[in-house]
């Protein structure tokens, strides 16, 4: 049976842990609000960029831009977006499981797969595996800005054009709400207008609603790289908001669990203390009776 002193130490440790998890929950909630505002502001722009590029890509030959060209190749790159820090529930675990499943599926089809990793958690996980990590970025979410999207997007665009890989997919957490995230596998290169923008067209956008100057081909050369930069930034913002939401939920659960443990141990402490006092009283009464 634990001593009363050990039980008091346990209660104090649980209370300290509860204070830490509660503080982390409050910090995550504040960061979530900022990240949520950013992604909600960025989504309409990213979707409109998709709409315009969809319209343009239907008017010109796909071979007019290297990022639109479909290749007959077997080299696949998978961009895996994880966090740099833990304590965010199943946020990273869901990503690495989905990424592993997708990579094995590609390999079963005879494809050669390389990885690009965003975040320390994904990097540390895949370094212990047999797959090749071509590029990695860490510290991106400390002060996330559009410059990070330019850096990541520039590297991936250049390597696609050079033929390092023939198709690019990204695995990331899409932000749905403060308590809900969804793992997404999205194809980025080559840009497939019919597949990627069908949902936008279904909302009522028609192909003849734009007039372009100077001409479609010249605008396409500018908008295709810009489109990928915007989508890369949107994906990073989605992941950042999803991470803060997952961490807030995880710390809220940890705080409540710590409270339950404190109640249980405190109750056990009180029962143990009461039993000890009762035993002492019985010893005193027994000793007094023996002296009579």
What are these regions (language model features)?
Residues 1-292:
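C-terminal beta-strand-loop-alpha-helix "lid" module of Rossmann-like NAD(P)-dependent dehydrogenases
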């Amino acid at each position: 049976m634990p001593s009363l002193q050990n039980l008091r130490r346990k209660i104090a440790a649980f209370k300290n842990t509860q204070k830490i998890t509660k503080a982390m929950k409050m910090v995550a909630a504040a960061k979530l609000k900022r990240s949520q505002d950013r992604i909600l502001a960025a989504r309409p722009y990213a979707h409109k960029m998709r709409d315009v590029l969809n319209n343009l890509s239907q008017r010109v030959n796909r071979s007019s831009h290297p990022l639109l060209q479909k290749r007959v190749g077997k080299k696949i790159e998978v961009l895996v977006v994880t966090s740099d820090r833990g304590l965010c529930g199943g946020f990273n675990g869901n990503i690495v499981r989905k990424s592993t499943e997708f990579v094995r599926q590609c390999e079963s089809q005879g494809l050669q797969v390389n990885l690009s990793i965003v975040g320390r958690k994904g990097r540390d996980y895949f370094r212990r595996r047999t797959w090749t990590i071509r590029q990695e970025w860490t510290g991106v979410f400390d002060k996330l800005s559009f410059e990070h999207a330019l850096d990541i997007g520039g590297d991936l665009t250049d390597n696609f054009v050079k033929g390092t890989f023939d198709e690019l997919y990204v695995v990331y957490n899409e932000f749905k709400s403060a308590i809900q995230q969804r793992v997404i596998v999205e194809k980025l290169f080559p840009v497939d207008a019919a597949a990627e923008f069908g949902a936008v067209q279904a909302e009522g956008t028609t192909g003849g609603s734009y007039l372009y100057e100077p001409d479609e081909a010249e605008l396409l050369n500018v908008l295709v790289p810009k489109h990928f930069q915007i989508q890369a930034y949107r994906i990073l913002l989605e992941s950042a908001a999803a991470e803060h939401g997952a961490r807030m939920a995880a710390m809220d659960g940890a705080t409540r669990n710590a409270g339950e443990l404190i109640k249980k141990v405190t109750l056990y402490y009180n029962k143990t203390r009461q039993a000890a006092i009762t035993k002492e009283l019985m010893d005193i009464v027994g000793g007094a009776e023996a002296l009579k």
